[in-house]
Every structure is written in C-alpha cells, then in structure tokens.
Amino acid sequence: MANEKVQNNRRPMGGPGRGPGGRFMMPNEKPKNVKKVVSRLLKYIGAFKVLFIILIIVVILSTLATLESNIAIKDLVESLGSYDIINHSWVIKDGVTQLPSKTLFYNSLLLLVGCYVLQVICQYFTTLIGAYLAIKTTRKMRNDLFAKLVKLPISYTDTHAHGDLMSRMTNDVDNISNTVSSTLGSLVSGVLTIIGCLAIMIWYSPLLTLVSMVSLVLTLLVTAFMSKFMRPLFQKQQSLLGNLNTQTEEMVTGIKTVAAYNHQEIAKDEFNHFSDTYCKVGLKAQIISGSMGPVMNFIGNLGYFLVCFFGAIFAIKGIGTTLQGEVIGAGIIAMFLKTSKQFTRPINEIAQLYSQILTALTGAERVFEILDEKTEDFTGEIKVDSSKLHGDIDFEHVAFGYVKDKPVLKDFTVDVYSGHKIALVGATGSGKTTIVNLLMRFYDIDSGKISIDGIDISKISKKDLRDNIAIVLQDAVLFEDTIENNVKYGKENATDEEFKRAIEMANCAKFIRRLPEQEKTMLTEGGANLSQGQRQLLTIARAVLADPKILILDEATSSVDTRTEKKIQDAMVKLMTNRTSIIIAHRLSTIQDADLIVVLDQGVVVEMGNHQELLAKKGVYNRLYQTQFSGLDT
C-alpha cells in the first residue's frame, strides 16, 4: 500500500517512519501554552481526588512542622538568656532580667525534635503518595492515549512517523510520571512553605523581610531569563527523540533488508546523524539547565549573608521591631536565618527542577496533541443486517486523492455482482490499493458514490461495513499471542468447533498440529517463528472464521514458494465460494478465472473484461500477460 501512495506523492508528511517533513527535516516548533497544559494535567491528577487530598494534608502537616521548628529555634536561643558583653551584665527587658531558662530550653528542644521527626514521617508519605498518584495518573493518560490512537483515522497514522507516536506513548508519558512523582509534593510544599515563611518573617521583622526579598527577586529574574533559552531547546530535544525512535524502529523491522543490501554503514551513518543532532541539542539544554543550580545556590547564599549582615546591624543599633514592638535579638536573627533559607529553598528547587518540569510539559503537550485529534466517525444512518446482505458493490464515478488537487483515482465506475470475483490489475501506483482503502472507508471519496446492495456506504456505520468485509494482506499481520487468539481475531466469540473448521478450510490444521503447543503456541512479534506461507494461511483462517460477505485479497500469494502457493490457492478457493471477492495481484496466473478483470493505469480504468476477452483485445492486459508468460518486452 505504501508504494502506491509514495509513487503518487500522496504522503504529505513524508510517509510512515519518516516523520513530519521527511527524514532529515526538523519538525516545525510551536510555542508552548504552559497554562493550558498545566490545567489539563491538573484535571488528570484531579481524577484521583482522595489521593490528592491526602497528599495535601500530609504536605500541610510537614509544612507546619517546618515552620514550628523555626519558632522553636528562636525560643531555644532565647532560653539561653540575653547577656550584654559590653557592660558584662544580663539584659533587663521590661523589668525582667533575661536569665537562662532550663524549662524553656527543654521545652523548645523537645518541640524541635518532635517537629523534625514529624517532618521525616511526612516526607516519606509525601514521596510514597506522590509516586502512587503519578502511576495512577499516567496510567489513565496512557490508556486514554492508546484508546485515542486506535480510533484515529488511518490517514493520521499514514502521515505521522510511527516511531514518534511510540515515543509519545512511552517516553513522554514516562517523563510526566517521573515529574509528577518527584515534583508534585515539592511544588505543593513549596507554595505552602513560601506563604508560611513570608507570614512569619513579616510578623517578626518587616525590615529583614525586605532584605530577604532581594534573593527572591534575583531568583525570579534569572529563572525568567534562562527559561527563554531552555524552552525551545527542550521542545526540540523531545522532537528529535521521536525521530531517533523512528529511525531505530525502521532499522529493527527492516534489518534483513539492511543486511541483504550491505547497508549497515549507511544505516549507521544515518543513525549517527540523528544521534549527533540530538546530543548537540541535549548538550545545550543541559548546559543551561545545569547552570541553574550553581546560580541559585549563589543567590541563596547571598540572601543568607544579607540577613546575617543587616540583622546584626539592626540588633546592635536597635533598628526595627517586630509587629508586637519587640526589639530584634539573637533569637529572632537565628530564626530569620533559617526561615529566610527555607523561604528561598522551594524557589531554588523549582528552578533546578525546571528542566525536568519543562521536559514533562513538552511531553504532555505532545500527548495532548494526539488526544485533541478528531477520531474516526463510526456512526451511520443505516443499520445493516448481515444475514440479508448479498454483496453487490457499485463504484459510480469515484474520484479520490490523498492530497487535494492530486487525484489518485479518476472517474472509477465498476459494478461487482454478488458472489463474483473481480481482479484489479495495474502497475504500482495505478490505484488498486486505493480502491480497497475507499471500500473499507479507511479514506472517504472526494466525489462519486460507492454502494453495497444499493446502500451508499457513507451512510453505513464503519463498524457494520467492516464487519462484513474481510481482508487478507500480502504482509500477513499477526500479533504476539497464541495461534488460536490470532485466528479468533476475526470472531472473538467463535466456538472451538468453528475454530477447527476454519483452520481446516485454510489448510493450516496440519502444521498447527505438528507444533508442540498446537493452537496454544505463542507467536513472537509479527509471527516471526512461522514461515511466510504459514502466516498467510493463518490470516486466511482468520477471514474464514469472520465469515464475511465481501472478501479482499491483497496480493496474498506473491511472496511464497509454488507448493505453499498451491495450498494458499486451495484455501482461497474455498474462502471465495459464494462471496463477493476483490483480488489485487500482479501475478496474472492467480486471476485467470476471475469474472471481471479491471486494468488500471494511473487511476483510470483502461480495460475491463474476463481473461479471454482482454487477451483478445491485444491491449494493456495482453502485454502484461505476454511479459509474464512469454518473456516478451512491453
């Protein structure tokens, strides 16, 4: 199918496995809508309200313990008394000598230890709940993404790199999971800590609070400045990772072709090109994000120094008081040092985690791009009763192009009668596979009409339509499952008797019985542990079990040996009996008994008739026949 579309330049995005714009072109970058992405992520997290509420409660307890420990430090310092080293006497405050207090000391110490223990416990549960919430959230997201992928139109997967789609399903969702797990609790805790610390600092010293704001302002300015450089780099990095996955997928699935044509070095060079580009972009991103930590630490230490310096000046000169009118002393300065450090710590942590958060948001945006795609419409106006369906197919002046103004099929008009066998013949790119795509409604026609039993297929639900059509592809598609389940893919509720009858009709019962596990034999990916002929026989058995009214055979015997082809032909003869059959084949020996042969050339019907009639015309079909059977040049 791919060849036809490529030959006709019908893949607007470069075709599967190439990525948008072709193999070596960089995808266009879009500006990120951070607010929208964060809002949608929060909706996913909000689906697990109980867990999220528990996390919030635990974080609040941890934050309160942290803030209370700061006040405990103030009381602990003040419990040692206040001694005037200049006058060599204890300070008298409000008529009370500030002597050491054992009671206040032990009470403060006990409270401090209790706060630290509670912090440790809360941090453990914060990590645990955060991880569990991340797993639950991303599981739902991954399930939604997969459910969306299987409902997208075939045109979407035809025009998007499969490796990039896989990257969104795996890498991007994993990045979201890791970020939610490691940063969600930190973000909530950080917000509460900032609010709590700010309230305490203002209460005990508005002047020192203003001094602490210097580091906050610097942190915000640096983060905003560096994010302008980091955001496009991380977006490009994610796109390049999708290209790497696409390249790897192509090489793994096509490794035999690579080896057969001694293409290993070229393949390696192509991969190195992608890998080097990814590394260069990744290195730039990591250099910038890596500098965030040292810069934030410097700003934090600067703020620490400013609090020490101005706090000492205020205390010595008696400048500034608390909101209660209390003069700043050693206890308040000690508390302020710790509180101001905690005040800037969440901001520094968020700044250092910025690259991870940005990667997750980029991945989330890529995931949401797929989730926002329009799904295939399976509804229909007319309900089809399979038991009453005959299988008459009418193509009336059908025209279609994968790209606007570039038709692949032009004025295609053919009548296929119930139970008849029609063969489509033509060079690669002539439109044969497109006809199948249109009949299955993988794509919708641009003009004209396709009818089954006089009913316009555009009015039939796609489910009803496809339930009555079975397709046997040249490249047999099997899944990593048992033989039995692969055959029953055509009818999941089939009985054992129906299954056995299907494999007998498809001539695959004998080789199945020779296998150690017989029908319970587990197939490897793509059925690689079976021969090509055995795989095709299983797909025929699947079609037999589906018991369709209409059958499509897409070059189903063009890549097997003569003996296997005979088995497949016998199975197909049984399968096609009393069914409307459409065959796509380049090997004219398989279609000589067809009721109607349609010869296509560049999307136009050039000849129609049975085998003998077309030979007598001495036209295109005759030349194809002579080429295959007489060795004559066209």
Predicted regions and their residues:
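ABC-type nucleotide-binding domain
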Residues: 379-380, 386-634
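An intracellular "coupling" helix at the cytosolic face of ABC transporter transmembrane type-1 domains
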Residues: 47, 154-155, 173-180, 184, ...
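Helix-loop-helix
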Residues: 200-214, 284, 288-365, 370
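Short intracellular "coupling" helices and adjacent cytoplasmic loop segments at the cytosolic face
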Residues: 24-29, 135, 143-167, 171-173, ...
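Transmembrane helices of ABC transporter permease
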Residues: 47-64, 112, 185-236, 309-321, ...
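Hydrophobic alpha-helical transmembrane segments of ABC transporter permease domains
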Residues: 46, 122, 126, 134, ...
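Transmembrane helix-loop-helix hairpins at lipid-water interfaces of multipass membrane proteins
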Residues: 52-122, 202-207, 318-324, 330
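A short amphipathic helical element positioned immediately N-terminal to and/or at the very start
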Residues: 34-49, 165
